[in-house]
């Protein structure tokens, strides 16, 4: 437990930031799973590409702002693009 006022404030700030960061990562997880689900269910190519674009946009934003490591963002984008290309070749 914090003993000083400033420590209490830091605890509150930390809790708020932690909650915000978790929400952002959760959004990303949902977007990535959405792309995977659309590919698995053989959805329309345009629908898959739209989901891909939104996921890549979110990855870029979170990587630049350091919510996730930039290399992780790059790796996930690469994995998504490989999945998308394989899906396009399959059709």
From Swiss-Prot:
Compositionally biased tracts (Basic and acidic residues): 1-21
The encoding gene: rpsT
Region entry Disordered, spans: 1-25, 71-91
Keyword Lipid metabolism: no
One matching Pfam family: Ribosomal_S20p
Function of the protein: Binds directly to 16S ribosomal RNA.
Alphabetized UniProt keyword annotations: Ribonucleoprotein, Ribosomal protein, RNA-binding, rRNA-binding
Protein name per its UniProtKB record: Small ribosomal subunit protein bS20
MF-aspect GO terms: small ribosomal subunit rRNA binding; structural constituent of ribosome
Domain of life: Bacteria
S-S pairs: none
Similarity annotation: Belongs to the bacterial ribosomal protein bS20 family.
Matching InterPro entries: Ribosomal_bS20 (IPR002583), Ribosomal_bS20_sf (IPR036510)
KW Cell cycle (keyword) present: no
One cellular component (GO) term of this entry: small ribosomal subunit
GO-annotated biological processes: translation
């Amino acid at each position: 437990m914090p003993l000083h006022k400033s420590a209490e404030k830091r605890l509150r700030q930390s809790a708020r930031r932690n909650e915000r960061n978790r929400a952002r990562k959760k959004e990303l997880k949902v977007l990535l799973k959405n792309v995977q689900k659309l590919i698995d269910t053989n959805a329309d190519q345009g629908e898959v590409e739209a989901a891909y674009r939104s996921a890549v946009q979110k990855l870029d934003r979170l990587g630049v702002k350091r919510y996730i490591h930039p290399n992780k963002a790059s790796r996930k984008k690469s994995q998504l693009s490989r999945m998308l290309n394989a899906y396009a070749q399959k059709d």
